[in-house]
């Protein structure tokens, strides 16, 4: 399995590197939506430790396990392994001797420790983040949410909380999605834009997308190109969400959306397993 993981990591590194190099051209010709799906396919391939091999040849040629040597007279004599005894020290190696740990086992331990440690680091950070903001959150009753849900034809209504500890709107929760709003006096138009952005993340299941990226990064924690891929995928995830939100919208809505994003941009800590409108956790 470990050999397959290293082989897949090496082969996919070439693909990732190529995509990162040609990204400027792809950005001009293809929307973020296509890059979003390309990274998804690569992440899935990185997670599945199965090598795709060509079928073996139907004809197998077996080589006889025999040793041929010559007498001085030049007459060949066939001697099998069972009857051949080399000269010199013929003492058998003790069957009880075995190395404490092989190199392959050592590599497996190092890789497993790194993979589990990397994954747990992000999961624990996510749990700490949720506990950190919980005392600073309160239920928000905003009628605009119903309007956005109706316009998007979404039946599932997420929980809406106002949190003084965050600096930008975001969505958390895998099974029970929750939209967090910072303690900012938004206009109704701004709220509509913010909620549509986060509801688009919910509709697409983008938190699961992020979890998939973290899983791939955990398995290939030793590969720096995978880190670059995850960074690019998270960026394209937000860009593709923006494209979906403003699709078929008039110029006024696009302007309002751009202004809202600019308003949300500030130096913040970003929770890995959350979506955010260009922001994150307040440093205050």
Language-model regions, residue ranges each:
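Active-site recognition of the HExxH zinc-binding catalytic motif
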Residues: 193-206, 213, 241-242
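Hydrophobic alpha-helical transmembrane segments and immediately flanking/interface helices
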Residues: 173-195, 279-284
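Hydrophobic membrane-embedded segments
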Residues: 1-117, 134, 150-151, 155, ...
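Short helix/loop segments within enzyme catalytic domains
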Residues: 136-142, 153-154, 203, 228-283
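Transmembrane helix-loop junctions in multipass membrane proteins, especially transporters and channels
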Residues: 27-28, 32, 57, 126-137, ...
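Juxtamembrane/interface helices at transmembrane-helix boundaries
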Residues: 37, 53, 92-186, 234
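A Zn2+-metalloprotease active-site environment signal
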Residues: 204-234
